[in-house]
């Protein structure tokens, strides 16, 4: 059923940055509503990588993506922000202090400011150009996202790619998969230096087979059951890797979707913002997280958290133009609704 909601801030996107924006706005007594095209909160963390380990959240040496979302859910619970999930924002009209947002299900949201936390926008995997790929995708022999590590227990796993996802999953599946081979077309990996060092150590121990420099060439099997992955080196020489599952990690193909039609200044499929406030080219509309772009931008979850705080503070005078904002630490004022 379509809903009509009036609030201070409409947050479009319910990934980590969008969820934390609820907290930052709530601490400034700004009402919020969360809108997301997915049917659950968490963005890619929940939909694609719930068991992926994250190592760069301050004070959390390691946490799975799903655990991070659970913690954020607990953190924002006191603010009871309404949610419009499974809704795609199709239209934005009005101006700073008086926006109207429409969704594909007919919802109407009236807000004084907007925070776009749409991540990469609409996303899907970059698929390798291999003959017969669709049959293996349908059977689960080729997977682009790992939602449950236990589903790969005892499997012969071939991972293709040279970035963080390929390296992190190779390390995470050690001791779970019966064998792990990592195929990369270059001798060096583009992952975080510490992760790349751990991968080299695992290879030296014999826990992981580094197949470099090679690239995917063909899949062999029958009726969707994978038997071997054929790889080729730079000279065209091939070898076969025994495999039950292939995990190609070649990044995501992303599309800003409706965001690109909202009249905002864009650059290379990102929304340009002012670094100190995260405000876009349209007054009253802000962008945070992976969708936002400015000089020196780092695509890190923790930077999205910082941007959420900056945007919330910049929004306060829009919602309360006659009220001075006195900065306070959370240790001083506490969190509303908590003991």
From Swiss-Prot:
Cofactor notes: Binds 1 FAD per subunit.
EC number annotated for this UniProt entry: 1.18.1.2
Binding-site residues for FAD, renumbered to this chain: 36, 44, 49, 89, 123, 290, 331
EC primary class: oxidoreductase
Gene3D superfamilies the record matches: FAD/NAD(P)-binding domain
UniProt organism field: Acidiphilium cryptum (strain JF-5)
Domain of life: Bacteria
SUBUNIT field: Homodimer.
Coiled-coil intervals, chain numbering: none
Family in the record: Belongs to the ferredoxin--NADP reductase type 2 family.
Required co-factors: FAD
Keyword Cell division: no
Name of the protein described by the UniProt record: Ferredoxin--NADP reductase
Catalytic activity field: 2 reduced [2Fe-2S]-[ferredoxin] + NADP(+) + H(+) = 2 oxidized [2Fe-2S]-[ferredoxin] + NADPH
Single GO molecular function: flavin adenine dinucleotide binding
Key words, A-Z: FAD, Flavoprotein, NADP, Oxidoreductase
Disulphide bond pairs: none
Xref: Pfam families: Pyr_redox_2 (PF07992)
């Amino acid at each position: 059923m379509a809903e009509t909601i009036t609030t201070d801030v409409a947050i479009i996107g319910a990934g980590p940055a969008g969820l934390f924006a609820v907290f930052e706005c709530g601490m400034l007594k700004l009402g919020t509503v969360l809108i997301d095209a997915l049917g659950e909160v968490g963005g890619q963390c929940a939909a694609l990588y719930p068991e992926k380990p994250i190592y760069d959240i301050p004070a959390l040496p390691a946490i799975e993506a799903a655990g991070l979302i659970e913690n954020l859910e607990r953190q924002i619970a006191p603010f009871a922000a309404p949610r419009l999930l499974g809704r795609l924002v199709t239209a934005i009209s009005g101006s700073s202090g008086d926006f109207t947002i429409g969704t594909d299900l007919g919802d109407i949201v009236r807000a004084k400011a907007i925070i776009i936390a749409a991540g990469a926008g609409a996303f899907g995997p970059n698929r390798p150009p291999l003959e017969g790929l669709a049959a293996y995708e349908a059977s689960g022999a080729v997977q682009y996202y790992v939602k449950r590590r236990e589903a790969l227990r005892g499997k012969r796993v071939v991972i293709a790619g040279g970035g963080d996802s390929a390296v992190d999953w190779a390390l995470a599946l050690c001791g779970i998969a019966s064998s792990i081979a990592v195929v990369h077309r270059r001798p060096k990996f583009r992952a975080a230096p510490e992760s790349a060092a751990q991968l080299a150590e695992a290879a030296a121990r014999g826990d992981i087979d580094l197949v470099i420099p090679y690239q995917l060439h063909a899949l062999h099997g029958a009726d969707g059951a994978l038997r071997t992955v054929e790889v080729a080196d730079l000279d065209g020489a091939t070898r076969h890797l025994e495999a039950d599952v292939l995990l190609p990690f070649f990044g995501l193909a992303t599309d800003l979707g409706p965001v690109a039609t909202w009249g905002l200044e864009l650059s290379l499929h990102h929304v340009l913002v002012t670094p100190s406030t995260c405000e876009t080219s349209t007054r009253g509309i802000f962008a945070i997280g992976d969708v936002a772009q400015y000089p020196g931008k780092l695509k890190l979850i923790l930077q999205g958290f910082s941007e959420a705080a900056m945007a919330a503070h910049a929004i306060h005078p829009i919602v309360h133009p006659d009220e001075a904002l006195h900065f306070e630490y959370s240790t001083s004022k506490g969190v509303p609704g908590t003991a």
